[in-house]
Design a protein with these regions (language model features):
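Active-site microenvironments in enzyme catalytic cores
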Residues: 2-8, 19, 36-251
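Short N-terminal binding/cap micro-motifs at the start of the first secondary-structure element
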Residues: 11-16
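A short, surface-exposed interaction/processing loop segment used at functional sites
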Residues: 21-38
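Surface-exposed loop/edge segments in extracytoplasmic proteins
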Residues: 252-256
């Protein structure tokens, strides 16, 4: 099941719905036509808070809509290419984890390549590379492994198809396609998965290792989420998932 939040040309109101046969269908319309009302599908936050019941009802409506889509009139469903897809969930918090040692090693090597002749950043990067490549100590028995992460800019989260304006303070903007795991609640911790485009200003990053990422990650529209919240049953094994993304960057004439 692919859950979406979207806007249509006819209304400024955000719709929470599902993809049926390449159509964006609001849950409000599905409930009305199927005669099955529930507050769990009012918006994405209600959906996440009421898992797993909300997922069960959503799938029932999806199955009904798939059988009866031909009965929907104008304005009740919308071709995906005619709507504006927003981030599929209203994000309460966004954390980016460094879970892949190979990725961290590659990142350190790339930064070292470009900054090796910079006396202000080279020592910091050497220390970072040493820390990344050093073997991690094993967690004590009965204690969870310590994970490193940073908190993302909550004001820069956007959906699919948005163009990232190139910040004037960087000449090396990097876009990484990552897998986002969407948290539901204690009853069902994993609500589903999204593609997450993580945008970074690499030439600014070295000097921010000491105090935490600021300009490196704080550019407008620098956290792109979407296009769908895909439920676990459709994803399968997320560790084997191949992520593909296409990014649009606009330097606006201001890129150094």
């Amino acid at each position: 099941m692919k859950l979406i939040r979207f806007l249509t040309a006819a209304s400024p109101d955000v719709c929470f719905g599902v993809v049926i046969q390449n159509q964006a269908v609001p849950f409000a319309v599905l409930q009305k036509k199927a005669g099955k009302a529930t507050p769990h599908l009012a918006d994405s936050r209600s959906y996440l808070a009421n898992l797993p019941d909300s997922e069960r009802v959503a799938k029932e409506l999806l199955a009904w809509g798939d059988l009866h889509l031909g009965e929907f009139g104008t304005g009740e469903c919308h071709p995906l290419e005619m709507v504006r897809l927003l981030e599929p969930v209203e994000v309460a918090a966004l954390f980016d984890f460094g879970l892949t040692p190979r990725h961290l090693k590659n990142s350190a090597e790339v930064l070292m390549k470009y900054e090796k002749d910079n006396p202000q950043t080279a020592p910091l990067l050497q220390a970072f590379a040493k820390a990344v490549m050093a073997p991690k100590p094993k967690a004590a028995p009965g204690r969870p492994e310590a994970l490193s992460y940073y908190k993302c800019n909550m004001n820069s989260i956007v959906g699919d198809g948005e163009t990232v304006p190139w910040p004037p303070y960087t000449s090396r903007l990097d876009v990484e396609p990552e897998l986002a795991v969407v948290y539901g609640n204690e009853k069902q911790p994993v609500a589903g998965f999204c593609i997450f485009n993580d945008v970074s200003a690499r030439d600014v990053q070295p000097t921010e290792f000491v105090g935490g990422f600021c300009l490196t990650k704080d550019m407008s529209k620098g956290n792109q989420l979407g296009p769908y919240l895909v439920t676990s049953d459709e994803v399968g094994d997320p560790s084997c998932d191949a992520r593909h993304s296409r990014s649009s960057l606009d330097d606006g004439g201001g890129r150094p």
